[in-house]
Amino acid sequence: MLQPKQTKFRKMHKGRNRGLANGTDVIFGHFGLKASGRCRLTARQIESARRAMTRCIKRQGKIWIRVFPDKPITQKPLEVRMGKGKGNVEYWVDLIQPGKVLFEMGDVSEEIAREAFKLAAAKLPVGTTFVTKTVM
């Protein structure tokens, strides 16, 4: 699963998921899956969506993952009293804002791309829309 090889600090503040999204256009492929809401996307969810898309297109096209989980989420063990420091890192997430392109696909027909993105969207905790590359 995706996670950084090295970070400056092991743990991070909780923070808030506000602001506008970067990466709102399809750049690498011809089709994209765009988020229509805010969420925390975990490494497991990204991997699950990637596998669903790969199986659907039968490894004939190319998939680009435009998100990377670089924020550590900590958790204390069950039935542990408050205090005694911050918990251990349990999983990694990426904060998603509306309009962010999550995945891109190329070298496949539009019907196959739509079907693959539909399967991937079922694995994600946020509403998504299908977008195509606009040529200027």
Swiss-Prot record:
Family matches, as InterPro entries: Ribosomal_uL16, Ribosomal_uL16_bact-type, Ribosomal_uL16_CS, Ribosomal_uL16_dom, Ribosomal_uL16_sf
GO cellular component: cytosolic large ribosomal subunit
Gene Ontology MF: a single term: structural constituent of ribosome
Keywords tagged on the record: Ribonucleoprotein, Ribosomal protein, RNA-binding, rRNA-binding, tRNA-binding
Origin superkingdom: Bacteria
Function in brief: Binds 23S rRNA and is also seen to make contacts with the A and possibly P site tRNAs.
Subunit text: Part of the 50S ribosomal subunit.
UniProt cross-references to HAMAP family, sorted A to Z: Ribosomal_uL16
Family named by the database record: Belongs to the universal ribosomal protein uL16 family.
Protein name, entry field: Large ribosomal subunit protein uL16
Gene: rplP
